[in-house]
Structures are given as C-alpha cells and as structure tokens.
Amino acid sequence: MSRQSTLYSFFPKSPALGDTKKAAAEASRQGAAASGASASRGGDAAWSEAEPGSRSAAVSASSPEAKDLNGGLRRASSSAQAVPPSSCDFSPGDLVWAKMEGYPWWPCLVYNHPFDGTFIRKKGKSVRVHVQFFDDSPTRGWVSKRMLKPYTGSKSKEAQKGGHFYSSKSEILRAMQRADEALSKDTAERLQLAVCDEPSEPEEEEETEVHEAYLSDKSEEDNYNESEEEAQPSVQGPRRSSRQVKKRRVISDSESDIGGSDVEFKPDTKQEGSSDDASSGVGDSDSEDLGTFGKGAPKRKRAMVAQGGLRRKSLKKETGSAKRATPILSETKSTLSAFSAPQNSESQTHVSGGGNDSSGPTVWYHETLEWLKPEKRRDEHRRRPDHPEFNPTTLYVPEEFLNSCTPGMRKWWQLKSQNFDLVIFYKVGKFYELYHMDAVIGVSELGLIFMKGNWAHSGFPEIAFGRFSDSLVQKGYKVARVEQTETPEMMEARCRKMAHVSKFDRVVRREICRIITKGTQTYSVLDGDPSENYSRYLLSLKEKEEETSGHTRVYGVCFVDTSLGKFFIGQFSDDRHCSRFRTLVAHYPPVQILFEKGNLSTETKTVLKGSLSSCLQEGLIPGSQFWDATKTLRTLLEGGYFTGNGDSSTVLPLVLKGMTSESDSVGLTPGEESELALSALGGIVFYLKKCLIDQELLSMANFEEYFPLDSDTVSTVKPGAVFTKASQRMVLDAVTLNNLEIFLNGTNGSTEGTLLERLDTCHTPFGKRLLKQWLCAPLCSPSAISDRLDAVEDLMAVPDKVTEVADLLKKLPDLERLLSKIHNVGSPLKSQNHPDSRAIMYEETTYSKKKIIDFLSALEGFKVMCKVSGLLEEVAGGFTSKTLKQVVTLQSKSPKGRFPDLTAELQRWDTAFDHEKARKTGLITPKAGFDSDYDQALADIRENEQSLLEYLDKQRSRLGCKSIVYWGIGRNRYQLEIPENFATRNLPEEYELKSTKKGCKRYWTKTIEKKLANLINAEERRDTSLKDCMRRLFCNFDKNHKDWQSAVECIAVLDVLLCLANYSQGGDGPMCRPEIVLPGEDTHPFLEFKGSRHPCITKTFFGDDFIPNDILIGCEEEAEEHGKAYCVLVTGPNMGGKSTLIRQAGLLAVMAQLGCYVPAEKCRLTPVDRVFTRLGASDRIMSGESTFFVELSETASILRHATAHSLVLVDELGRGTATFDGTAIANAVVKELAETIKCRTLFSTHYHSLVEDYSKSVCVRLGHMACMVENECEDPSQETITFLYKFIKGACPKSYGFNAARLANLPEEVIQKGHRKAREFERMNQSLQLFREVCLATEKPTINGEAIHRLLALINGL
C-alpha cells in the first residue's frame, strides 16, 4: 500500500539560511523521476529501493536529522507572501490540471493550506497556488499559477488521445477517475476531499520556492534581475565566502543519491519540453556547449539524508505542531553550512561539506576508510601491493562495509572493487554521477563541481558523456559507463518472482555497458566524433627468446584500430636491439600496449620504457587474461564471432585459418610458426571482451597478416631480383622517420615542417591514412613506381576533371569509420546479449537521429563516390597508369576495374524508407518490399481486418440488422454492438455478452476472439519489426560490406594520387619525374640528384635563399675522375648546411620511390631498399642510454642490416665521446661502409684527420659545403665567414667553429682563449705527425732532410 508523503519528497535538500535566492539558482537541476510517475510515487521512489516500506523519505520535523533544518527553513520560507485571492483565476474547491517540473499534467484540487489558511502565495512576480494531487496517497504542494489549467473531465477533447493532457499511465488514469467523481460534486463536498492536512514540511515550502524561481527565471513575463540569484555573502563564518562572479550553480545531485537512494529515471519520449538545461556539476563555461538543454528539463528527485551518515535512519515520529519544529539557531547554521559551495576548486578538493565549521581543511569520507588507505590496501584476493601476483585493477572491500551501505552505493562499491583502475560514470536517472575518488578526478580534470556533503560527488547530464569521457581518455584515464538496465516496473516484476526479497534486491539493475580506453575508442553515437584522422592502435605483444642464442628473440604481435575494426597479426624474429619491433611501432604507433606479465625481456622493457613511455601499458595475467594460442582459437570458434553471413557454421577468416595446423581441419590447433601471434591475438580478444566491444569488432572478420618490411631483403640474392617484386617496400625504421622528420618534427613534436605536412593535401580522412602508410613504406619495384608516376601525369593532364573531383571529395565524410559504425549498430550479436541492448537511455531519440544521420551521410557519400568514378571514367581511356584505370573503372564494365557498381544498391536504399522523416523523428519505417518481416506483418493485419469486416457483414445479414457495428479499443475491440430491440430477440448461442450501454448490447463470438487474436499477433509482430527495424536495416546494408569497402579503398588511392599530383605540379621551383633504374650485373647502385632542393624548407622559408645542390653517389661521371666511390665524406663549416644536405638526400629518395615528382632538375637512382640515419645528438633518459650509446646503437643497426642497395646517412659520428675515441670509431665505420658493404653513404664529419686518411682512397670521395672567408688571420674576431650552402668537391680545410661561437654571442675573451688553445692543439698535432714521419723515414735507405728541418723549425716556434 502506498504510504503518505508530502511534496518535499520530490525535491532535494534546501538552501542555507537566509540564502533563498541562491537556492532558486542551485535547484535548477535538482531531482526528477520518470515521466508519468505519480506525484506521490515520485516522492516515495527516492527511498523505496533503499528501505522498502519505510517512511524515511519524509523526514519528520521532530527527528534529530530534521531538527536542525526546520527552523532555518521556516525562516527562509517566510519571505513568501500571501496575496489576495483576486490575483488568481482559481478558488478553493476548483479542479485543475497541474504540472510540476519533470512530471506530466496531473488532476488536482485547489484548497487552503492547512496552517496558513491561504491557497495563494507570491514570490517576486510569481504566484503559486496550493493544491492536492489526486492519488492513492494524496499529496499536496505549491504549483505555479502558469502551470494550472481548468479540469473539465476525462472525456474532454484535451484529455483524449492527441490532447494536451492525454496520458496512458495507469496512475494518471486513476487520478482522472477520482477527479471525475469530484467534478460531479459541489464545492463544499469537494473541499471535504482535502484530507492531506498534516503539518507542512518546511522543506516543502522552500523547495516550492526553488521550483517557482526556476520557472520564473525561464519566463519573459516573470523575469527578474539575475543578480537576485547570485549567492549572497554569508554571515556564518569563514567557510561561507561570497561568490564574486554572477553564475548559476548547476548541480545534479546531493549526497542522498550517494547514500543509495537509487532514484530511477524512466525516460518518456512523449513528454513535452524535456531537455537538458540542468547540468550536474558542470561549470558555467560548459553550459553553452550543452546547447540542447532547454527549459523544462526533468529534474531528479532527491530525498533527505542524515547529515554525515552513511545509512538512512527510519524515522517514525510525526510532527505534532509547527512549534515543535523550532531549532536552535547555532545548530541550524552548522547544519546549513553543509549546503554552501566552496569558493574555488582547491578548497573543494580538500574541504568536506559535512557541516564542519572548523577553519582548517578536512578530508573526504573515502579518505578516512582504513582499508582504502595506500598502506592498507589489498586486491580482491587480499594480496598486498608487494605481493608478486597483486592485481592493481581490483580492490578488497570488507563485507561488513558493503552491508552497511544502501543498495545503490553497495552496487557502486561492488563495481569499483572489480574495476579499481577505471573512472566509473554511474548512471542515476538522466545523469552520470562520479563518486568518491572518481569525483575528485572529475573535478580536477573536467572542471565539474562538487556536490554538497562530506562524500566527494560530482556529475553531468547524459548528453555530455561523449565530451567528458573523451577528455578523460585523452588524459590517460580509463572510463567505465554504467547504465540502468531495467526500469522500476521491471524491478518490481523481478522481485515478485523471488521467494525472499532483501533491500539489496529492490534496486534497479545496473551494468557496465562499455569500458573506454585510449586504444579501444570506437566513436559510437555516445562517444562523439574522433579528434584526428589517423589511426590509433591497441597493440598486444608476446615474446620468446630463441633457444639457440640469447641475442635473438621471436615476437608475436597483434594490433587493431578499433575505430575501423581492422586487425593485423604476425610473428617474426628480431635481433637483440629489437630493430623490427621498433620499426613496427613507428609505422603503426600504438596508444595502448598489452603484454603478458613476466614474459618480456630486458631489451623489450627498455623499448617500452623509452620509445613508448607515453603509451598506456597494461600487463595481463598469463592464461586467464593473456590466453595461449589454443584457448584463443577455441574462444573464437565457440563465441560465434564469424557467423551471420548466411551460414550457421563458424569458419575462421582465411588469415587465421592459415595460422592453424594443416593436420587439424577443425582449426583448434595452432601452427608451429604462429603460436605467439595467436596468443597475442588472445590478449587482444580478452581485452576487447572486457571492454565489451569484442562482438562488434571481431564479427567484421577484417584480418591482415603482418610481415616485417625487411623480410625479403637478403644481401645474397641476385642483384636487383628482389626489386622485381611489387610487394617489396623501402624500410624506414623509427630512427629514420624521426631523423628525417617525415611525420613529426624534432622541435615541438608537431607536423609543422615535416614531409607529411608538405605532401598532405588529401581531401578525405581515409585518404590521409593511406598517404601515411605509403610514406611509411615507399615502393621498391621500378615498374610499380613508374605506374604511380604515370598516374600523377595522367591526373596533371586533366586539370578540369581534377578540380571537379577535388570539390566532390571534400564533401565525403569518413566513410571507412562510418562503415564500422553501421556494422556495430547492425550487429545481431550485440543486439541479443550486450548490456547496451538493455540500457535505459534518456536521450534515445537523439542517439537514433545521430545513427540515421550517419547512415544517410554514408549513402550520400557513396553517391558522391559514384559521381567521382563517372567523371574520371570518361577520360580513363587516355590514362597510361594501370592503377588509376583500375580505381576509376567499374567492375561491371571491365574485368580489370575495381570500383564496384553501386548504382542499383543506392537506388534500393533511396526507396527503402522516408529519409527526411527518419532524420527528423529518429524512427525508420520501411517501405513495402524492403523488410520481409514487416511486410508480412502488415499483410497479416490487412488480411485479419478484412476477415473481420466480412464477418461483420455476415452477422448483419444473419440478424437482419444493418446497424450492427464493431465497438471497443485495444484487446476489447471488435465487440458486436447490437441495438437493444434486436438484442432482445433470439441470438445465436455463440454470442457472448461483453458489455452494455443504454440502447444497445455488445457481444463477442469465438470466431471474433480467434480472428482478434490473430490480428493482435500480427500487430505485435509489426511493432517488434519496427522496434528492431533500424538494426536490421543497418545489418542489411552491412551485408554488402565488401563492395562498400572496395569503393572506399579505390577512392582512397585516388585521393592520394591527387595529392601527389597536386604537389608535383605546385612545387616551388623546378620539379622532375624520378627515373628508377633496376640494378643488374652491369648497373651498380647509384644516386644522382642534380639541382635538388629540400622539399620542406622551401615551404617553411619562402624566397630564393635556398641554394640547389647536386648530390652524386656512385655515378658514372664521378667514376671517370675518382673511381666508383660509394661513400662521400662531407665536411664544411659549422652551420654550413651539412645536416640539411644529408636530410635532403634521404627525403628525395623517399619521395622518388613514393611515386612523386621531386624538387630537382634531374633525379636518377637505383632502388633503395632501406634508408639508415645517424643524425643529431640526444640521449634517452627514460631508457638509461647516454648520448654516445645512442650514437653507437644506431651505428650498430646500420652495420648489421645495411646492404649494397641501402642509403646510409651519418652526421658527425663520434662527437659524444673523447676526440681520439670518436675519431677511431668514425674511421672504422667509414672503412666498413666504403670497403665491405659498399652502400651509398653520405658521412659528414669535423674530424679532419679522417679526411686526410681517406683523401687518396678510391672507395671514398670528398665533398664539402662551400663558404667564403674574408680577412682570414690569426685573430678569429677579424674573420668574416659567408656560407654559400653549395656542395662542391674536395675537403674543407677548417670547420670555423669560432665563427659559430661568435654568432652564438659567446664572450669575446672566451673565444680568444679558445682560439689560442686550438692553435696549441694544432701545433702539437702537427709535431706528432712530423715526428711520426721522421721515425718512419729512418727505416728507409734515405733520410728526408726537409722533414727534419721543418720539425726543428716548428719546435723552435713552440
């Protein structure tokens, strides 16, 4: 039986003493329950789950918990003034429709307040009327005059379907019956129905003022100065400082919900005026972003909680009189101070709102829990952090503590104990709440606002989830979205089926519906749009050291871009420096890494700690979390991930099937060379399963095997044979990508000044992603490179078409990601058992509209693609490039065409449903012929309706009465309404009387019952089809995924080719087509760039300052003078351009093999299989590697992996150690590169002794960056150095380091002292050299007398 309550039950706690206007502002987002819940039930629901049957929701004025509040709140409410009845259109005894914020219109009775003796109050310009709500347990309250309408009966037009007051809710229908009964009575009799005459709760009066203030603030006619809502200076002590800035405090909840009131919100999409203006805990700066939040937002109901307590107390005492409620003023101040907002976020973080009046900072409640303190914390198995198997993602919560919690809070702690590493967004009604330590994160990272109370608590509305969750995820947090997965009605039904129901059962179910991390973002309609176009990978890694040697290892890897649903899986051996693994993470940069605990070697840990320190890294427990290969295969087969394509059997994708043992036809035995790869996949599958996105991603069956780029690079193969393979790619490792600044610059880590920025003019996101992959792995096959260059020239030859195509491509959305989204929405697996399918979403209509908008955007995008294909197909006959012809030619018109013919399919979708109606309503109603289930249901409905009409005609003829008609609604339809004069005659025995009215009787027959049952069944099937219509339509669209994906791939290739063509014809200065020569027996590796320029500097620095240079290595014309020298020693003055020249050579080689024109007058080269770089000087602090160690590590990689076809770029090797050590190492490296490996090398150095050593070598050629020296003398301050930036033959005599010192503004005396010291070193070096020559000369038959004289002269000069 419903218990009696007051309107106070609907609203949260009241404001501080003397601050009623601030209360009006703060209450704007407080409390509402489900639309359509009755007024009394709305108040009771706040406590029903926590303590069923208790009356603790309405805190009695005599209880200790309420005693401190009553007096203060009565004083606050005294500001409301009684006004003459003439100011109101209603009088006591009138029946009205009344609407309170967040509730539907409700039948009410106007009557005088039981103690004030008036039914009207005025606050500012607003007028309120006292009413009693008709309900099982009548309740009363003050309602705005503007929210009252005359009640004219349940049969009135406005109360019927389509009317303003119509409702199908049973509570309202019962209230209307009571109001109809009252309508037939006179005023005196009606007033006797006013039975709710208990002493008024003080909070009721104050909270009604809050409600009215909110409404009046929204009204133009009742608008008053906003400054009245500003928080006023406090008179209660230092804790209550005034707020200086005018702002509305937007609050979502009070500690009552934290305490587990567990108020549930049941969305009602039919409710008018519901929106999201109330933003829980969201700062004012965010309020404009929540643009869809308008006035009339349903407010969440709040119940009062005992101050500072964890559990509600059941309060039995009733208030005897208003006098008994008078409190002690000091106690009131102390209690009400709990409701004041701290002045700044810093104080919010430390000062509790528990009513403590002390001036010093206190701590949040969760910080006082002993078992939660770091020194006492344990995991779920009670293991301490120093235990080797400690699990930091779980938390031990004592059972006695859980038992002391209210049901809502108990559920939160249970979820938190299993997911301690997550920030939990806990759904309460239409808001996501953050509690305890999560709330502290929300305030510090998101700018939310703490709620009042000694429990840390903040929140925000549902519609803002995407923005706030993404903000936390980008900062490295992991977010769990917890949704309500049953309504209160469903909970009640569940409890009725249980034999024994505890208070913990009487709480609606909540489940984790999604865990979001950096590596698992899918950008669903809740998550929002991606912030960048490039892929972000989740990488799983398993390692095994080779038994034969401790210096090599084998990696199993699996990585996935969750926004696309594309998996890469592979297994490869690697060296002790993890070279291949470093290259992988450079080409596919992960944002999150999974690995098996205890599995990684020291070298791999060094890579993770150094190069990948910014990634989230998570160790998984072997076996239970990081699965072995066998468990992975079994899970994939038993999970049914790869069914749904018309075949009920589960078949592994070809890539995975190829990794199983050939002897096992079932596919449960891993292949010998794939165990680690499949185990790495197991780690990924486990994590995706944990994040609840395994079904939507794996069901796409989009797998690709990963092979290291240098797999085919073997130095022993026949010269040039490897380059005939179209699959062969140039290897650019992580060091090279960084040193050449291909993707990110070394200054601030952005793309400014990089090759990617220079080239990237792609119009589509998927084109940008493809360009990046092409840059990671340029081609090596001369024929493939030439075909791309042909495509560039073909496009340059049709500028008009290119302009039209470019304009069309700009209109395309990210179709690659949209296809993944559509697949996820249409997934039948997800719709069957995923928690999201049970979630109660307040903004469901908004999300449906977003899904439809995405879908229609995809359809429009594919139409644009067809136009693009058609435009270029007109001129495709003149194209020489095979690739370009393939991507623009329809498969239906040419066997070599790759672009699918989408015309028929797109026309089918144009007629599938009303696009504009679906866009506006968020609902899809399929047209005839598109959805067989829906069509069959409609056909059955028409058939049964026609059958019933025919039966009516038969009964009319049978009884000889043409006035017989059908009557009834719902399941009581199709009653034969027969005039009474006919009904009195002998009727057939099968006629069963159902109802009567004056003048006629109504009958059913067995035939009607049977036909109606068939009709109802057909209608239910229709409704079920409509409910699941969007998913099934998306699933239908996804059946042609291969065609859609092929179209995207073709347009992506076209977009990148257009990008290359755009650069090729728009470069600053001369541009040339590279000539790639296949090496053979008579053609040795060479590189010839004439008049070449740096591709990026011309964009960064405009003008004619950049000097073009010739770079020749191994060319015939050079061989005539100096022999075939593959190594060029580059010298020159500091800041003379040596490093720029070296980077320029590497970038031009990359661009040439990418298939792009290069900024040069001439470009010829044999394919480069790999570019190595040793540039710059920096240490790796995180890896514990010094500057010199980094130099030697990079050099070791060069010597270990370089082949005769490689391009090696070394800049000042040896500078990180002692001069003689550095010189010796540099000398040895040059010798190895020039004489043993014989690869194309540019080696810059300031070691002039190195130049002298190789000045006569036929394997090494000398070159330097020219400069002009004026006033060269002993005094460096008198010299003037002019850099010519021209690369010419020969060696530079000096490095002119003191010129660089002067340009850097070193003190002159320091430069002079340094110069004198340098002269001393030079003389000593010359002396030692001459002495060595003398000593060598003594071994010869004749003595070099000239050398002796020079030595003596030098010694005398010292």
UniProtKB/Swiss-Prot annotation:
Gene transcribed to yield this protein: Msh6
Residues modified as Phosphoserine: 14, 38, 40, 91, 137, 200, 219, 227, 252, 254, 256, 261, 274-275, 279-280, 827, 932
Key word Transmembrane helix present: no
NCBIfam families xref list: PRK05399.1 (NF003810)
Protein name: DNA mismatch repair protein Msh6
GO cellular component: chromatin; cytosol; Golgi apparatus; MutSalpha complex; nucleoplasm
Pfam families noted in UniProt: MutS_I, MutS_II, MutS_III, MutS_IV, MutS_V, PWWP
Ranges where the record places region Disordered: 1-87, 197-360
Taxonomic classification: Eukaryota, Metazoa, Chordata, Craniata, Vertebrata
Species of the source: Mus musculus
InterPro entries named among the record's database cross-references: DNA_mismatch_repair_MutS-lik_N, DNA_mismatch_repair_MutS/MSH, DNA_mismatch_repair_MutS_C, DNA_mismatch_repair_MutS_clamp, DNA_mismatch_repair_MutS_core, DNA_mismatch_repair_MutS_N, DNA_mismatch_repair_MutS_sf, DNA_mmatch_repair_MutS_con_dom
Family: Belongs to the DNA mismatch repair MutS family.
